[in-house]
């Protein structure tokens, strides 16, 4: 038995990757056995813990002291990052998750799986419940099944976020970027709005960036470390990245480029480890979900008819539309006096083409950046722009600030750019800036290796001030975040009223913060008229409703989707005596009326509610029907 080297601590990143891989693997296995329940979860993670104890001497080792030394530094950059991290942690502890995608389908699918004690293809018009990647959900499932609460889910993102600074430094420096410059970016980049706003959220975009960075980190270590574990960990990390979100699949390309560049090192001791990891990597990647999508829909995406409208019909329109959305989210200040719709400013021919080929196009900018649409932010974009300008200027002037270009790093960065363009030419979503969260680190690194500068660049006052401003600009966003406000919202509303702030501004403020305050259980009042003993409740929805709140209190009832095409006998046969009906679903999706539905089902309306799920949509009418 080999002893751990003196002074070395556990490689916590490796443990996180192993834990994530085990969670995905055990989720699928327990589902197949029908044991996705407390007993199965306890047995599974007992095996994982036992394996860690038995093989503790062989676990990857790293230096855990360097990070603490950096945080104890008197320099401002680590302190600002630490401040933002603490603020994010407070928000995560204080509030229930309110991410809308999480409430509409990500947590909802976990609720279905836990009720059925395994993964299942859910009969629903919210198809995202079925075809989306499952990586984040397999981390949520054991927490929910054991503790029957969603208040711990923020820890998934928070733990992952803690690894980001060290990974940025490792990947950047291995790409040939000077260590001084890498040191600054390791603090600046994690303060990007898309990362810090999701650090205590239940969103599943930014945490995939950590898996991607980890996959490169362990590949780069193949040459400097004799450990055969690095190739295996890299393989697992890249698989986890794809399992989290299918939109991350193009990022496999730069990983393969690094594999090619490291082929001689991998051909030795690392090859058996990587080959051994491949079966597990396949199981925890997006591939199982792709195969299930093919089985149930005939298409690996799960959306053969593009019902979600997320596949653009023209690659050029995709690149242009996504670029405009990136500009809208990242070239404006984090705080704006009022919302602005930039669509009318487009030339008429371009506007017509984008609305035809890129239906989800959204050029509305709100008063502040929120996690649903945030990218890295204006400060980081300006800082990257400064490196481009200074790099060109230094090269033209023949300045000594110019560093030598690293050609292999250029190949990796070029592959990252190609991956981003592939995404932008194929995918059309209104949330481009958020969905590209895993792409930004390599794109920023691409700027730094294309326009290489000597480490003395960080001593320039302009760089330091711009870096500090970029980091500090995230502080008000974390404090003002509507999903997790760290200030007394009601007190501020009263002060605004007494200070004669225009009524429209106060009304907008009140609506946004009140909607977010209720979002985690926004539909719960629909359950109030239903007797407590009802174990199954019908649900007729639009496909984008916050279903998770209907399951409260968790474990007491199952929500089953119905449609107007179902007969009364079909509905009753499923044990349903009450149905919750969205008027918007009847009007816009099924093109029918509540009167028709009541007549068909011989039902009566026992309650009618007006509920605001999203601040920009306003109140929606809901009915509680008794059969």
What are these regions (language model features)?
Residues 484-489, 503-556, 578:
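Short periplasmic/luminal acceptor-recognition loop of GT-C membrane glycosyltransferases, typified by
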Residues 95, 272-370, 476-483:
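Membrane-lumen/periplasm interface segments of specific transmembrane helices
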Residues 149-160, 197-198, 337-413:
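Membrane-interface anchor segments at the N-terminal boundary of transmembrane helices
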Residues 49-58, 152-176, 214:
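Transmembrane-helix motifs of polytopic, lipid-linked glycan transferases
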Residues 75-83, 229-238, 252-259, 272-283, ...:
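Signature aromatic-anchored transmembrane alpha helix within multi-pass, membrane-resident enzymes
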Residues 1-71, 378-383, 426, 571:
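Membrane-embedded, hydrophobic transmembrane alpha-helices
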Residues 6-14, 151-152, 168-193, 210:
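Transmembrane-helix signature of polytopic, membrane-embedded enzymes
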Residues 20, 82-85, 183-190, 236, ...:
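Transmembrane alpha-helix segments characteristic
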């Amino acid at each position: 038995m080999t002893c751990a080297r003196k002074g070395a601590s556990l490689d916590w990143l490796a443990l996180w990757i192993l834990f994530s891989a085990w969670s995905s693997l055990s989720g699928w296995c327990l589902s197949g056995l029908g044991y996705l329940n407390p007993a199965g979860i306890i047995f599974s993670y007992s095996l994982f813990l036992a394996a860690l104890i038995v093989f503790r001497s062989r676990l990857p080792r790293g230096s855990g002291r360097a990070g603490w030394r950096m945080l104890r530094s008197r320099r401002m950059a680590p302190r600002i990052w630490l401040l933002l991290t603490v603020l994010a942690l407070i928000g995560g502890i204080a509030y229930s998750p309110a991410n809308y995608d999480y409430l509409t389908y990500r947590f909802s699918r976990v609720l279905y799986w836990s009720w059925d004690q395994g993964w299942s293809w859910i009969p629903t018009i919210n198809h995202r419940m079925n075809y989306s990647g499952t990586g984040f959900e397999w981390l949520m499932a054991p927490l929910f099944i054991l503790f029957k609460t969603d208040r711990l889910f923020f820890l998934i993102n928070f733990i992952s976020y803690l690894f980001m600074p060290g990974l940025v430094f490792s990947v950047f420096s291995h790409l040939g970027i000077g260590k001084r410059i890498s040191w600054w970016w390791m603090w600046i980049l994690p303060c990007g709005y898309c990362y810090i706003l999701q650090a205590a959220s239940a969103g599943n975009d930014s945490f995939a960036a950590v898996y991607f960075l980890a996959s490169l980190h362990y590949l780069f270590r193949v040459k400097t470390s004799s450990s055969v574990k690095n190739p295996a960990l890299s393989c697992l990390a890249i698989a986890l990245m794809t399992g989290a979100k299918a939109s991350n699949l193009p990022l496999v390309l730069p990983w393969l480029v690094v594999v090619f560049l490291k082929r001689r090192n991998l051909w030795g001791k690392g090859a058996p480890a990587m080959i051994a990891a491949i079966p597990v990597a396949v199981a925890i990647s997006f591939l199982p979900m792709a195969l299930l999508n093919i089985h149930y829909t005939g298409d690996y995406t799960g959306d053969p008819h593009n019902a979600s409208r997320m596949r653009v019909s023209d690659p050029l329109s995709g690149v242009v539309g996504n670029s405009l959305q990136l500009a809208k989210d990242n070239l404006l200040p984090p705080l704006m006096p009022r919302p602005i719709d930039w669509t009318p400013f487009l030339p008429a021919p371009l506007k017509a083409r984008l609305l035809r080929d890129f239906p989800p196009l959204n050029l509305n900018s709100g008063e502040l950046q929120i996690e649903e649409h945030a990218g890295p932010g204006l400060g980081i974009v300006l800082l990257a722009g400064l490196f481009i300008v200074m790099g060109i200027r230094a090269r033209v002037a023949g300045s000594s600030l110019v560093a030598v270009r690293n050609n292999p790093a250029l190949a990796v960065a070029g592959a990252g750019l190609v991956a981003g363009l592939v995404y932008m030419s194929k995918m059309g979503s209104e949330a481009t800036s958020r969905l590209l969260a895993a792409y930004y680190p390599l794109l920023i690194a691409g700027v730094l290796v294309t326009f290489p500068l000597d480490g003395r660049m960080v001593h320039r006052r302009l760089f330091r001030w711009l870096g500090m401003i970029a980091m500090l600009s995230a502080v008000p966003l974390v404090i003002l975040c509507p999903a997790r406000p760290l200030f007394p919202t009601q007190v501020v509303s009263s002060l605004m009223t007494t200070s004669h702030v225009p009524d429209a501004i106060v009304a907008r403020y009140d609506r946004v913060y009140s909607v977010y305050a209720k979002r985690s259980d926004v539909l719960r009042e629909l359950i109030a008229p239903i007797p407590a003993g009802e174990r199954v409740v019908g649900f007729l929805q639009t496909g984008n409703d916050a279903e998770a709140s209907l399951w409260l209190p968790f474990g007491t009832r199952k929500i089953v989707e119905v449609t107007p095409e179902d007969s009364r006998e079909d509905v009753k046969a499923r044990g349903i005596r009450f149905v919750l009906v969205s008027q918007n679903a009847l009007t816009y999706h099924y093109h029918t009326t509540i009167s028709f539905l009541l007549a068909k089902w011989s039902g009566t309306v026992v309650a009618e509610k007006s509920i605001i799920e999203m601040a920009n949509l306003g109140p929606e009418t809901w009915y509680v029907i008794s059969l």
